[in-house]
Amino acid sequence: MVSMVIVHPKKDAVDDIVNLVNDSRKDGVPGLEVYNIINSNDEELIFINFWESIDAFVEYINSHHNMIELIEHLCVRIDEENVSKAYSGPLLYQSN
């Protein structure tokens, strides 16, 4: 199971966001196998998370560890309700 979250950091907030996310995950997150943080050329931060199962992913979204709630004050809002675009689904292929 893979989830991807895209946010647009406020000016000079990239390092703060990365540090907050890494600090919140330093002791591990149940079911999170690997995560990557990418700073794109379009002033976006892209988080790619690999989960052991959909259940682990859903549990995380509903927990107090929810990444979006942690960083939303450092992000530009997309609309009234959202600071991110999020996608999730099964991993169909991964090369070695």
Residue ranges: model-predicted function:
Residues E43-F47:
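A generic structural motif
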Residues K26-Y35, F50-S84:
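An amphipathic, aromatic/His-enriched active-site/gating alpha helix that lines ligand/cofactor pockets
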Residues D16-G28:
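Short amphipathic alpha-helix segments
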Residues A86-N96:
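Short, low-order "capping/linker" segments at domain edges
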Residues I37-D42:
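A short beta-turn/loop motif at secondary-structure boundaries
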Residues H8, I48-F50:
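Short hydrophobic/aromatic beta-strand micro-patches
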Residues M1-M4:
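Extreme N-terminal starter segment of soluble prokaryotic enzymes
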Residues I6-V18:
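Short, surface-exposed ligand-recognition loops at beta-strand->loop->(often short) alpha-helix junctions
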